[in-house]
Curated annotation (Swiss-Prot):
InterPro entries: Integrase-like_N (IPR017856), TACO1_YebC-like_2nd/3rd_dom (IPR048300), TACO1_YebC_N (IPR049083), Transcrip_reg_TACO1-like (IPR002876), Transcrip_reg_TACO1-like_dom3 (IPR026564), YebC-like (IPR029072). It is found in: Cytoplasm. HAMAP family: Transcrip_reg_TACO1. It comes from Halothermothrix orenii (strain H 168 / OCM 544 / DSM 9562). This is Probable transcriptional regulatory protein Hore_12350.
Length: 253
């Protein structure tokens, strides 16, 4: 399906497990610290910080942790200086990979990411090699199993609030917005009582690469997990689409 991220749905199902691991809090702290360092510690004046704080709150990160992360960014508390950068490359089956990273040692991170990729059938590419395959969009996900609203109601409310597109797959309804409309659309929908299981500005694939070979699909998922598990990787985006029947077979193994 064009313009939809299968990985976003898979990640949603893994989110509770991620929270237990505690790795998510570390990544969220880093995101807040870098946003505060680059744009100041006032979320009203810093949209990147506002988004990072909201994401932390969505994942039940304690306010004390959030405040400490902001102060590390503004210099009120001592902290590691992180650099923000992007890597692009390819995974098994030729799927595109777009990685957003934060690290205090870019050379170390580059070597480690290269190792993860080569070990799992992927490789780094030149800057710009896959970024044109993605579009930055607001992405709000509603779990229809947990929502008080049905699919038609949600679609109508979303479009009236200014959403660009609404897609339903695997009982997850994804609302896409222009990045500049993201906060306003979210605010309007929350005022209607709609709850989101995740809300973020993401790199969404313009078109998908169909991975209909089970062996390749397993390799893609293994690589995505390995990249997500790396401490310096903040976000992993990909354009793969694994058919439901193959996903079910893999899940049952």
């Amino acid at each position: 399906m064009a313009g939809h991220s299968k990985w976003a749905n898979i990640k949603h199902k893994k989110a509770k497990e991620d929270r237990k691991r505690g790795k998510l809090f570390s990544k969220l702290s880093k995101m807040i610290t870098v946003a505060a360092r680059e744009g100041g510690g006032d979320p009203e004046m810093n949209p990147d910080l506002r988004l990072a704080i909201q994401k932390a709150k969505d994942n039940n990160m304690p306010n004390d942790n959030i405040e400490r992360a902001i102060k590390r960014g503004t210099g009120e508390l001592e902290g590691v200086k992180y650099e923000k950068f992007v890597y692009e490359g390819y995974g098994p089956g030729g799927v595109a990979l777009y990685l957003e990273l934060m690290s205090d040692n870019r050379n170390r991170t580059a070597a480690e990411i290269r190792h993860v990729l080569s070990k799992n059938g992927g490789n780094l590419g030149e800057s710009g090699c896959v970024s044109w395959m993605f579009k930055r969009r607001g992405q709000l996900i509603v779990d229809l199993n947990e929502s008080d609203f049905d699919e038609d109601e949600l679609m109508l409310e979303a479009l009236e609030a200014g959403a660009e597109d609404v897609v339903t797959e695997d009982n997850l309804l994804t609302i896409y917005t222009d990045p500049s409309d993201f906060e306003e659309v979210r605010k309007q929908l929350e005022e209607q009582g709609i709850k989101f299981s995740s809300a973020d500005i993401a790199m969404v694939p313009e078109n998908n690469v169909n991975v209909d070979d089970k062996s390749t699909a397993k390799k893609v998922l293994k690589l995505m997990d390995a990249l997500e598990d790396h401490d310096d990787v903040q976000e992993v985006y990909s354009n793969f689409d694994i058919p439901d029947e193959i996903m079910e077979e893999i899940t049952e193994e």
